[in-house]
A protein has these predicted regions:
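Short, amphipathic alpha-helical interaction segments positioned at domain boundaries
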Residues: 64-95
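Hydrophobic, helix-forming membrane-interacting segments
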Residues: 90-128
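A short, conserved structural fragment
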Residues: 48-59
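Short amphipathic alpha-helical interface segments
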Residues: 2-32
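Short amphipathic alpha-helical interaction segments
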Residues: 33-50, 66-67
Length: 144
């Protein structure tokens, strides 16, 4: 089965929105957009394997698999923060679509580069702010 990056993003957004402290969601009872239950189950399993979510995976006697999701991990939050913005996500998808296979780690790195490019573009509109950002990045604390 192929991992659907849109399903990954939508599931992470759903987990962040719906799962509170001391709560969980069962992937079997989760419905998101146009994704099949198999897509959601496969995505949840892969996110758990990758360390992006805290989940309990149970192999049931009838041969089915149950996944209870308790939270995003620190890495899950970092990944979601990189791909949350719709404009960033759209640009990231257009870049990675040019390749036949791209890991979630690469998707996250591309999204981070897209964000940095957008920040750099914004900083270019304010030269003084750009100078301060550059100097502080070099470790210079005497900006003023």
């Amino acid at each position: 089965m192929r991992l659907n990056n849109d399903c990954v993003r939508d599931l992470l957004l759903t987990i962040e929105e719906e799962v509170g402290i001391d709560e969980y969601i069962s992937i079997e009872n989760t419905q998101i957009k146009d994704y099949s239950s198999d897509d959601l189950l496969y995505t949840a399993l892969k996110l758990q394997e990758a360390g992006y979510i805290n989940a309990k995976v149970t192999n049931c006697l009838d041969g089915s698999v149950s996944v209870d999701i308790f939270s995003l991990t620190w890495d899950g939050h970092k990944f979601l923060d990189n791909i949350r913005d719709n404009e960033v996500w759209s640009k990231t998808k257009s870049i990675v679509a040019k390749f036949s296979s791209v890991s979630l780690g690469i998707v996250s790195n591309v999204a981070a580069q897209v964000i940095l490019a957008m920040i750099k573009q914004q900083l270019g509109q304010w030269p003084l702010l750009s100078f301060c950002f550059y100097d502080s990045w070099k470790g210079n604390s005497n900006l003023w």
